[in-house]
């Protein structure tokens, strides 16, 4: 047994001895190879150093690949912790906005209106009638009316904080929601004043603060056009200190509305500009529809639906919940602004009260516009002076240069409409004619002659070339590639009657038998007889045209014609309006060689006998039936 164990041990010893020898031989052989390789590398290194560098680079690449592989393996393993998300940067100029609609809380006004006394003068927008006044009160009232051309006595007794009662706008206006995206732009409200009554100015300011969302109203800028009333200086400065967003800028000398508004626009910092007059009151939800429309259309110039505040009682004419027969702006050929009812095609285009109204012109006192677009489109004509014509000029320019004028019926702002201006013109009313000439020369092309025939002051300014430099305005017209006035008449205001560019005769109609001229009289909008009046050669009420249709037209503010009738001759709406209409017999006149004005329908002639011209049996020897039709000087 012991012998057997020794044999086993010997066998094992021999077996492992052979293994060790084999392993040793392999190791020895590997060492020899390494030595030889090292010697070879050393030789090569001494001769070719650049090859060594390439080898090192290859080794580095191999290491990089190995590390990348390790990282890939690591990333492929399940993660036990969640990392924070990486915030994505928003490109400069992009304004983030949330989806959905603004809430009532988001559109909360700047200030909450204080509690109201329902029995206070003018409360809820009601009329305040000033009757049974004492002698002193009556004198105060008369002084206020003379100074401001409205009842300042009543205004001073109405709270600066008065509300306007329930929101009476149509339901679609009250329920209208405004999208957060694109966001509603901010606005700077600009109010120009010159010797304005304290109560109307500050009621305007308070009204804006009580009805404008704080997130939209960036500032109220009061621009003082060199007021001389002391209460509008230090006292006003002190009063507005309580409102951080109200600021006052002042012009040391009176330069007028146009320059003052340009000053306000220069200092404004909001995305849009909203211009208001200094005797306004804003109704509920007035601002949002204006700004929403600009957010939708950068080129839209939008006005509120202007409600009337009675100049005597300060009653606010509130909107109807059933909607109303809206008006839009127009112009006449004396370049005065007016109102007219909507044509059928505009009524049919609008589906409800939230839809804007396209308007050929705008009143110009109350409107909102993108500040960037205001500057791009040419702001105001800086060479226009004081006031007058700037709204018609801007109306033509906006439409002809690619923008649009609109009225937003859900936006309601009240305005005190005065029958006359309380302010004087430093250079006289000639500045209005000069302003109008500037707009006519730039925007009306050959149609400007229609205006010049109706305004002798304007014609003289043109003749003397006293309208100033127009190069900047023409540069704007060229830069914006604006359309001509024919395009405007055909596409924007096709309803307007365009008088003959070259009428047979135009000017005054003078009696041979006495030194008097045919005159339409004051405020004759049709339906009244004409009068005979001293000839003045200034056009206006004594301007007439003998048309190619044989009418005698006085179409300045309205299309009015001499209308033959038994007895007194009247001024009535012209029956010929173009567009396949015809002239009725009562409005056809023939100028005969013997200077008679003959109506073939009644077979009678016009006579200057009496205060009012009339039709009589024709008598060529009667000097009162003879007329001179002549152009104004």
Curated annotation (Swiss-Prot):
EC number of this enzyme:
2.4.1.41
Required cofactor names: Mn(2+)
Region: Catalytic subdomain B; residue ranges are 356-418
Task: Detail the disulphide connectivity of this chain as listed in its UniProt entry.
Answer: 517-535, 561-574, 605-618
Instruction: Identify the residues that the record assigns to the Ricin B-type lectin domain, covering every copy.
Output: 504-630
Instruction: Describe its membrane topology.
Output: Single-pass type II membrane protein
**Which amino acids does the record list as binding Mn(2+)?**
277, 279, 415
Q: Where does UDP-N-acetyl-alpha-D-galactosamine bind?
A: 519, 522, 536, 541
Question: Result of mutating residue 519 to H?
Answer: Loss of ability to glycosylate FGF23
Q: Which residues lie on this side of the membrane: Lumenal?
A: 38-633
Q: Does the keyword Mitochondrion apply?
A: no
Question: Where does this protein reside within or beyond the cell?
Answer: Golgi apparatus, Golgi stack membrane
Protein role? Catalyzes the initial reaction in O-linked oligosaccharide biosynthesis, the transfer of an N-acetyl-D-galactosamine residue to a serine or threonine residue on the protein receptor. Has activity toward HIV envelope glycoprotein gp120, EA2, MUC2, MUC1A and MUC5AC. Probably glycosylates fibronectin in vivo. Glycosylates FGF23.
Domain comment (free text): There are two conserved domains in the glycosyltransferase region: the N-terminal domain (domain A, also called GT1 motif), which is probably involved in manganese coordination and substrate binding and the C-terminal domain (domain B, also called Gal/GalNAc-T motif), which is probably involved in catalytic reaction and UDP-Gal binding. The ricin B-type lectin domain binds to GalNAc and contributes to the glycopeptide specificity. Essential for glycosylation of FGF23.
Q: Which disease is it linked to?
A: Tumoral calcinosis, hyperphosphatemic, familial, 1: A form of hyperphosphatemic tumoral calcinosis, a rare autosomal recessive metabolic disorder that manifests with hyperphosphatemia and massive calcium deposits in the skin and subcutaneous tissues. Some patients have recurrent, transient, painful swellings of the long bones associated with the radiographic findings of periosteal reaction and cortical hyperostosis and absence of skin involvement.
Q: Which family does it belong to?
A: Belongs to the glycosyltransferase 2 family. GalNAc-T subfamily.
What is the name of this protein? Polypeptide N-acetylgalactosaminyltransferase 3
- State the organism's lineage: Eukaryota, Metazoa, Chordata, Craniata, Vertebrata
């Amino acid at each position: 047994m012991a012998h057997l164990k020794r044999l086993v041990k010997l066998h094992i010893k021999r077996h492992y001895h052979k293994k060790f020898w084999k392993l040793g031989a392999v190791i020895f052989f590997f060492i020899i190879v390494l030595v030889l390789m090292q010697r070879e590398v050393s030789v090569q290194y001494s001769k070719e150093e650049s090859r060594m560098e390439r080898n090192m680079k290859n080794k580095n690449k191999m290491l990089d690949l190995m590390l990348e592989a390790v990282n890939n393996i690591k990333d492929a393993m399940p993660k036990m912790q969640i990392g924070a998300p990486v915030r994505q940067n928003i490109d400069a100029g992009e304004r983030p906005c949330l989806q959905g609609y603004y809430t009532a809380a988001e559109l909360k006004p700047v200030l909450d209106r204080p509690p109201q006394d329902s029995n206070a003068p003018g409360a809820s927008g009601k009329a305040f009638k000033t009757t049974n006044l004492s002698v002193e009160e009556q004198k105060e009232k008369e002084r206020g009316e003379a100074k401001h051309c409205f009842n300042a006595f009543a205004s001073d007794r109405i709270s600066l904080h008065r509300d306007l009662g329930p929101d009476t706008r149509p339901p679609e206006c009250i329920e209208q929601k405004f999208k957060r995206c694109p966001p509603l732009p901010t606005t700077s409200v600009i109010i120009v004043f010159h010797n304005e009554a304290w109560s109307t100015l500050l009621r305007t300011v308070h009204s804006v603060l009580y009805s404008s969302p704080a997130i939209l109203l960036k500032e109220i800028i009061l621009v003082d056009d060199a007021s001389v009333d002391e209460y509008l200086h230090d006292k006003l400065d002190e009063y507005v200190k309580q409102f951080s967003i109200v600021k006052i800028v002042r012009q040391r000398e009176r330069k007028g509305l146009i320059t003052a508004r340009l000053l306000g626009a220069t200092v404004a910092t909001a995305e849009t500009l909203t211009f208001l007059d200094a005797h306004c009151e804003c109704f509920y939800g007035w601002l949002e529809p204006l700004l929403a429309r600009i957010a939708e259309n950068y080129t839209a110039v939008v006005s509120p639906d202007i409600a009337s505040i009675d100049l005597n009682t300060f009653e606010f004419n509130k909107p109807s919940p059933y909607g109303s027969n809206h008006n839009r702006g127009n112009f006449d050929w004396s370049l005065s602004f007016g109102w007219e009812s909507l044509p059928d095609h505009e009524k049919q285009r609008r589906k409800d009260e939230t839809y804007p109204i396209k308007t050929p012109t705008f009143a110009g006192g109350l409107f909102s516009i993108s500040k960037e677009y205001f500057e791009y489109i040419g702001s105001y004509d800086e060479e226009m002076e004081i006031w007058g014509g700037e709204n018609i000029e801007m109306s033509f320019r906006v439409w002809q240069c690619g923008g649009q004028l609109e009225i937003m019926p859900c936006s309601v702002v009240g305005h005190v409409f005065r029958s006359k201006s309380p302010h004087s013109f430093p250079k006289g009313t000639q500045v209005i004619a000069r302003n109008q000439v500037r707009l006519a020369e730039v925007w009306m092309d050959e149609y400007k002659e229609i205006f010049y025939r109706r305004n002798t002051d304007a014609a003289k300014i043109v003749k003397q070339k006293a309208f100033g430099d127009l190069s900047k305005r023409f540069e704007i017209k060229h830069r914006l590639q604006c359309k001509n006035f024919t395009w405007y008449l055909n596409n924007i205001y096709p309803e307007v009657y365009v008088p003959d560019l070259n009428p047979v005769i135009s000017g005054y109609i003078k009696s041979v038998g006495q030194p008097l001229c045919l005159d339409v009289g004051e405020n004759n909008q049709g339906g009244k007889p004409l009068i005979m009046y001293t000839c003045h050669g200034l056009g206006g009420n004594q301007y007439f045209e003998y048309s190619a249709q044989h009418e005698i037209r006085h179409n300045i503010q309205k299309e009015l014609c001499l209308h033959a009738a038994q007895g007194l001759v009247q001024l009535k709406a012209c029956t010929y309006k173009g567009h396949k209409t015809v002239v009725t017999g009562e409005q056809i006149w023939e100028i005969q060689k013997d200077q008679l004005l003959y109506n073939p329908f009644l077979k009678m002639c016009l006579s200057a006998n009496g205060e009012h011209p009339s039709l009589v049996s024709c008598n060529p020897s009667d000097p009162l039936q003879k007329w001179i039709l002549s152009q104004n000087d």
